[in-house]
Amino acid sequence: MSGKDRLAIFPSRGAQMLMKGRLAGAQKGHGLLKKKADALQVRFRLILSKIIETKTLMGEVMKEAAFSLAEAKFTTGDFNQVVLQNVTKAQIKIRSKKDNVAGVTLPIFESYQDGSDTYELAGLARGGQQLAKLKKNFQSAVKLLVELASLQTSFVTLDEVIKITNRRVNAIEHVIIPRLERTLAYIISELDELEREEFYRLKKIQDKKKIIKDKAEAKKAALRAAGQDLRDSANLLDEGDEDLLF
């Protein structure tokens, strides 16, 4: 395992616990981001279907509005100056609010009517019915345009956030988690190797002490066979063992 495949860390019990915690955190974060991406995808597909539906309806509404404009001009004549003289402010205005989807803020635009709604225009003696129809059709067109602008803004915002979220999910799934798993496996293998080395070292020390003890017992037996008083001899078994290092 090359150093690029894992994190550079000294193998120890503390490092093992640290890697386990980081791995658990990465897996939890991956799960949360995956759920967020799924929720955004659901809203994204819903907005896409609404955009298609609204654009289809927009074609019909704009066609009707254009026909109403031509009809009103044919009936009334040029009424632009009369409208400009009698209209002091716009009745249809736009307000915005915010919607939250899985932590993503989406701007929502909606149109509303400010003030009284009247179809009577001073100075127009004929064509009132056509003008009322014209105004109503263009109000519907403005409402749809505002709705479409809101949907497309949310569409672009969600598209960018989904791309970023998917990149993060892929990075955690294919880079971060595998690297943490390889690092944890490396630490475990190194600790196992250290345990085997320690076991082997302790076994060699025990074998060495057994050999020394057997030699001391043999020497003691030889002295006893020669009739030598062992009480006057130094007790070899009481001598301190020298340090055995490997």
Swiss-Prot record:
Keyword Transport: yes
InterPro entries hit by this protein: V_ATPase_D
Keyword Ligase: no
Coiled-coil regions, chain positions: none
The family this protein is said to belong to: Belongs to the V-ATPase D subunit family.
Job of this protein: Subunit of the V1 complex of vacuolar(H+)-ATPase (V-ATPase), a multisubunit enzyme composed of a peripheral complex (V1) that hydrolyzes ATP and a membrane integral complex (V0) that translocates protons. V-ATPase is responsible for acidifying and maintaining the pH of intracellular compartments and in some cell types, is targeted to the plasma membrane, where it is responsible for acidifying the extracellular environment.
Subunit structure, as described in the record: V-ATPase is a heteromultimeric enzyme made up of two complexes: the ATP-hydrolytic V1 complex and the proton translocation V0 complex. The V1 complex consists of three catalytic AB heterodimers that form a heterohexamer, three peripheral stalks each consisting of EG heterodimers, one central rotor including subunits D and F, and the regulatory subunits C and H. The proton translocation complex V0 consists of the proton transport subunit a, a ring of proteolipid subunits c9c'', rotary subunit d, subunits e and f, and the accessory subunits VhaAC45 and ATP6AP2.
This protein's name: V-type proton ATPase subunit D
Organism: Manduca sexta (Tobacco hawkmoth)
